[in-house]
Amino acid sequence: MSPTPDPSPVPSPGLPQQDEEQRLRELGYRPVLARRMGGFGNFAISFSVISILSGCMTLYGFGLNTGGPAVMLWGWAGVGLFVLCVGLALAEVTSAYPTSGALYYMADRLGGRRWGWYTGWLNLLGLLGAIAGIDYGAALFAGAFANLQWGVKPTPGTTMLVFCVILLLHAVLNLFGVRLVSLLNSVSVWWHLGGVALIVGALVIVPDHHRSASFVFTEFVNETGWDNQVYVAAIGLLLAQYTFSGYDASAHLSEETSHASVAASRGIVRAIWVSWLAGFVLLAGLTFAIQDYDATRTTDTGVPPAQIMLDGLGTDGASALLLIVIVAQLFCGNAEVAAASRMVFAFSRDGALPGSHLWRKVSGRTQTPVAAVWLSVSVACVLALPSLYSATAYNAVTAINVIGITPAYAIPVLLRLRAGDRFRPGPWHLGRWSRPVGWTAVGWVACVTVLFCLPQASPVTVGTMNYASVALAVVLVLATVWWFVARRSYGTPSAPYGSGRDQADFAEGIV
């Protein structure tokens, strides 16, 4: 099918809905996962992974120091627009290749094996780092809640214990099958939206004092140690960019989604724009309610939004709203485990991981990649272990997440642009807007990848260093070393599924 001049990113009206199982066979894979997720569930998983109640709350303190209210609010508006371009461009390629492998499969088909290999490793380690970052963040917030409610001061050991319990919970929930995952993600959507409404509503109604609109939209604050305000504003954009990540989850769950060639693409785009609007409301509501800026920025709770709630609503009100945030983080981590495990399954299916024959196994009862789920949470646990000894280690885990996932989004889009008319779009496409939106997306990702690697505080020390560049180097070195070891075993299918070898391979992959 060739692109149409219709600029609207909607399915072409003259096309019949594809048989998704047959389409998957055409892409070279036997359907082994249960296709029980609807369009809303597919949107819900990306919305849950983006999780404005997780990202905005966790990095709000970073925003207070790095540009302040003006950069947080206007940065969110601007970054959201560019991220929407990335999502639109990625959704178009997803419609053409609706597989669990998602980004790396797209890159492999459009650019060759090496492109697919490096994209896959960036995406995989980014997803595993995201599980560690999200669930460890939830453990930190749980510690703040315990301190606020019962005066219990969390230690690195207790935080790690809570983190491991959360990981175990998410693993078990994902073993029950995609129907439960889809249900939890659907609940998560309304929990997030209702939570934002409740938090903002309470902060608007209850406190006697509010900041002026001039303060919220124009106040610039620099506590980074850097003198250049443009530089500070640029790195301040990372609050929004970090939050707007993980929307590739819709693509990773496409083999379990009905009408995936349309629903997965819609899921990506809807998750971004709904998060964009709701996140702006949340940030504005928090900022208007700040009672004492410096006290909030340096709060003993370690969680500035908790201090805003405490000052404006009292201990009981703050505890209740903090609990809403913690539950939202749990929804977020559960969705991330689902996405990461599908990536592990798909990458193993194509022979890219050590012990691939183990990790690609699918339960015949629940039709879920059981071994991939356990591997995902186990690696996430290992990534977070250094946090027992250093708070800086948590920053490094976050760096692995963002520096892995962010460039991986742009690679399939760049290769699609390079392919030109050789690219055959699916039923969901951008028409004549494909190239301008695509180049905007690639340019933005290139810019923010550089921003992610810049030092965020001065002077640069072991404790303040930005480890994103180190994480990127480590990922690329590991991927290169393993390429020379495993390149003979790795490969996406070059023909439709149905050969005797393929059937034998997958017969032993069902447990």
Segments the model singles out, each with a brief description of its role:
Residues T158-H210, F215, S245, I268-W273, ...:
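Membrane-interface loop-to-helix entry segments
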Residues M72-L73, Q149-T158, V187-S319:
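Helix-loop-helix junctions that connect adjacent transmembrane segments
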Residues T58-L59, N65, G75, L84-L167, ...:
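Hydrophobic transmembrane alpha-helices that form the core helical bundles
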Residues G55-Y60, L173-V178, D316-G317, V379-A396, ...:
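Transmembrane helix-loop junctions in multi-pass membrane proteins
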Residues F62-M72, A146-G157, V178-V189, A320-I324, ...:
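Transmembrane helix-loop boundary segments of multi-pass membrane transporters
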Residues Y104-R109, R114, D135-L161, G195-L198, ...:
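Helix-loop-helix connectors at the membrane interface of multi-pass transporters/channels
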Residues M1-M37, V413-V437, P455-V511:
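Terminal cytosolic tails of multi-pass membrane transporters
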Residues Y105-A107, G112, A144-W150, E223, ...:
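TM-loop-TM module centered on a large, flexible mid-protein loop between adjacent transmembrane helices
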